[in-house]
Design a protein with these regions (language model features):
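Sec-dependent N-terminal signal peptides
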Residues: 3-13
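Flexible loop/hinge segments at secondary-structure junctions
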Residues: 17-129
Length: 129
């Protein structure tokens, strides 16, 4: 019975909405899945001509779900991608922050874009189901 309850809780968590948000001071008004994928793979550093800095979640479940839904990569594929990027000297993966660290960083830097299951963290641009 305990395992059934645990599996129900975990499966419902896997289907949580993920909010894409930015600082309240950022001028960005919309973002697409493609924009996010390119940004989080560091193929670009702007969206609609506005500079943004992607931040990853330290929460492993939220991180995995975001990359699965938006970037269409598993953790293993993502690891291989970043190893290649680092080895060839191209770029580093986005910085990872906890929710608490992220809230502080959003107040300090208006270029931050991030994701979380808590839509109250910043100004929401997009919700991923």
């Amino acid at each position: 019975m305990k395992s059934l309850i645990l599996s129900i809780i975990l499966s419902s968590y896997a289907f949580c909405d993920i909010s894409i948000f930015i600082s309240h001071n950022n001028k960005l008004t919309k973002v697409s899945h493609k924009d996010l994928a390119n940004l989080y793979l560091k193929k670009t550093n702007t969206i609609n001509g506005i500079k943004v800095i992607p931040i990853d979640s330290k929460n492993k479940k939220v991180f995995t779900e975001f990359y699965k839904k938006v970037v269409k990569k598993t953790p293993k594929q993502l690891h291989a991608y970043w190893m290649k990027q680092i080895y060839t000297g191209n770029t580093q993966p986005p910085k990872k922050l906890s929710k608490k660290e992220l809230k502080k960083e959003l107040k300090r830097n208006s270029h931050i874009i991030a994701y979380d299951t808590d839509s109250k963290t910043g100004r929401v641009l997009l919700t991923i189901k």
